[in-house]
């Protein structure tokens, strides 16, 4: 297996221009494909997950052109439902942001489509979404294990009243919301359980509005969407920088700044993960907000005990930043870490112990007490881009760290390690 050893870093200082947001990129691609008119997306993320979405749209007859660096995409919208010519199988890797929305959107109209992916994708639950789509008339079969991909979709979704469990993943609701306007009837979506990762729903609603569709949001408990609508291209659309990706650089600034500034997001960003900066501030770092940047300057860091449900992806970065804070850090209400690219609660606890931390792994929380001295370790990354990026922060000590399978960052940030090196001064 490939590995990368990071030598100790004495100081970080500089500016990072963030790649486009994964959450925004894949939503925007799908809406542009469904819309009438041509859409030019700029600052699109070039990563595995986005390539899976693009390949799927291409197989569904959507035409687009990409710039050489794959960050500008001009898409010709279909002005409605996506149709496959005959039976089709789409391979979506481990891209939840492609699997969930496509599973819903391809239940409109008459299709016969199989959605499949990597072995890990077949372990990521999709039953709550399928249940909701079936209530709206969709014909869906599980081809292997009940409640998990691969799925066979044969159209039939017509709207009406559907209930969806919101306690596992907000992507199920996102998928229903983006599909509902194209259904023949109005759709009312009622949420069962507590809705996790609410800010991701705001991204969805924001993008739908950009493409000309309004949703009635009744306090995140019920959503009412009129049927027989059409998405309309906004013409040009700039994809915000990825706020989850920003978290590693901002944390590095908090631990070993200098000052690290990330551009492409700012105080008015639609991504909930910008709230990560508030956590660093609470720990003792200094944060400066601009319209198009967030900057973090080093501070004496103290442990925090916080509910992290609103920023599940960025919260992982706090788990490794906790190694540099005084006291015991507790991250709560993060059950949905368990259904991401890997079981992130287990993975994080296991790897933090390797570098010497004392860790308590709960059902939906993690408690971390840093050691007096970090130990050198080879960090397993579980084919999870965020594990690789989180543990790069260990090098901000006087101990090197080895990251196994470093290329797994390609899911969202192919040149992450080069960017980190660019702002680092070796010890």
From Swiss-Prot:
Gene3D superfamilies: Enolpyruvate transferase domain. This is 3-phosphoshikimate 1-carboxyvinyltransferase. Its EC number is 2.5.1.19. It is found in: Cytoplasm. Catalyzes the transfer of the enolpyruvyl moiety of phosphoenolpyruvate (PEP) to the 5-hydroxyl of shikimate-3-phosphate (S3P) to produce enolpyruvyl shikimate-3-phosphate and inorganic phosphate. Pathway: Metabolic intermediate biosynthesis; chorismate biosynthesis; chorismate from D-erythrose 4-phosphate and phosphoenolpyruvate: step 6/7. 3-phosphoshikimate binds at residues 22-23, 27, 169-171, 197, 313, 336, 340. Disulfide bonds: none annotated.
């Amino acid at each position: 297996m490939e590995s990368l050893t990071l030598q100790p870093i004495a100081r970080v200082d500089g500016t990072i221009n963030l790649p486009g947001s994964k959450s925004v990129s894949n939503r925007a691609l799908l809406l542009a494909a469904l819309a009438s008119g041509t859409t030019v997306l700029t600052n699109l993320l070039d990563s595995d997950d986005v390539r899976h979405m693009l390949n799927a749209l291409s197989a569904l007859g959507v035409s687009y052109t990409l710039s050489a660096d794959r960050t500008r995409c001009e898409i010709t919208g279909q002005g409605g439902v996506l149709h496959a010519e005959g039976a089709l199988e789409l391979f979506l890797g481990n891209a939840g942001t492609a699997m969930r929305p496509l599973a819903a959107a391809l239940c409109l109209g008459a299709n016969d489509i199989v959605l499949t992916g990597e072995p890990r994708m077949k372990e990521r639950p999709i039953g709550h979404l399928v249940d909701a789509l079936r209530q709206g008339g969709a014909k869906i079969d599980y081809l292997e294990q009940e409640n998990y991909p691969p799925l066979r979709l044969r159209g039939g979704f017509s709207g009406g009243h559907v209930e969806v469990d919101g306690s596992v993943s907000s992507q199920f609701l996102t998928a229903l919301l983006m599909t509902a306007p194209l259904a023949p009837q109005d759709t009312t979506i009622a949420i069962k359980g507590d809705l996790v990762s609410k800010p991701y729903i705001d991204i969805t609603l924001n993008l739908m509005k950009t493409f000309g569709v309004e949703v009635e949001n009744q306090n995140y408990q019920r959503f009412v969407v009129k049927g027989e609508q059409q998405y309309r291209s906004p013409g040009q659309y700039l994809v915000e920088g990825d706020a989850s990706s920003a978290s590693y650089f901002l944390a590095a600034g908090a631990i070993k700044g200098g000052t690290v500034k990330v551009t492409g997001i700012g105080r008015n960003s639609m991504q909930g993960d910008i709230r990560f900066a508030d956590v660093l501030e609470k720990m003792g770092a200094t944060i400066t907000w601009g319209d198009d940047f967030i900057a973090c300057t080093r501070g004496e860091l103290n442990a925090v005990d916080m509910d992290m449900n609103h920023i599940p992806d960025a919260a992982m970065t706090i788990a490794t930043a906790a190694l540099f804070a005084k006291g015991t850090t507790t991250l709560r209400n993060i059950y949905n870490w368990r259904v991401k690219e890997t079981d992130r609660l287990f993975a994080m606890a296991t790897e933090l112990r390797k570098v010497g931390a004392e860790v308590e792994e709960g059902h939906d929380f993690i408690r971390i007490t840093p050691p007096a001295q970090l130990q050198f370790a080879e960090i397993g990354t579980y084919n999870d881009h965020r594990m690789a990026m989180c543990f790069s922060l260990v090098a901000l000590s006087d101990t090197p760290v080895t990251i196994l399978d470093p290329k797994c960052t390609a899911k969202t940030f192919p040149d992450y390690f080069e960017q980190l090196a660019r702002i680092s001064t070796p010890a």
